[in-house]
């Protein structure tokens, strides 16, 4: 009997990956923003049409850093229909999650129900795109601007998705991407942040490296979330094939529908 897998990691050929990692033995640069890391970051910026991007070692730490870099306080309105990582990241930052119901058709947060939950303690909305379904980004943008709230997206499910000709990750203040092994694009484990404000780059660069600034100072405590060169090399290989992976998944969806 042939097994039909629910998920299966996409991988390049053994030969392609070996060829990609061979230069690591020449540079002996295994982590700390090495050549592969820089190459993948630039390639993803171009592919996703991103203004600014920061790579990290996994999607959860990306979300944790997104919340931290925005200096949030108090409450964050989010969805209960998400992976536990979303809520964990809120709590780990000393923030209180406030749950808003979802749209039963798209499974994304119901933008029409958010305003009733906003209080003087609310500092942000953390919305999650689900199963490739995009949140009501236009309503969410208006709400965030009206109440002066930060708008963060968990975009783990929407790699490469566009809305009205724009990358979904271009909406909001910052979007988190997951490059976990089960995602349509993976770096084995990995994640990234896409954002508009250029000044966040140096801040995130420090936050993903124990809080160490480019000058070598440590103005605040933080974590280690650096992507290593072997992860980046897998990403470089998989990015060459991601369009075909997306097409394969679209064909599966069409068959079920």
What spans do the regions from the language model cover?
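PLP-dependent aminotransferase-like
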Residues: 68-155, 162
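Phosphate-binding glycine-rich loop
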Residues: 29, 33-75, 81, 89-92, ...
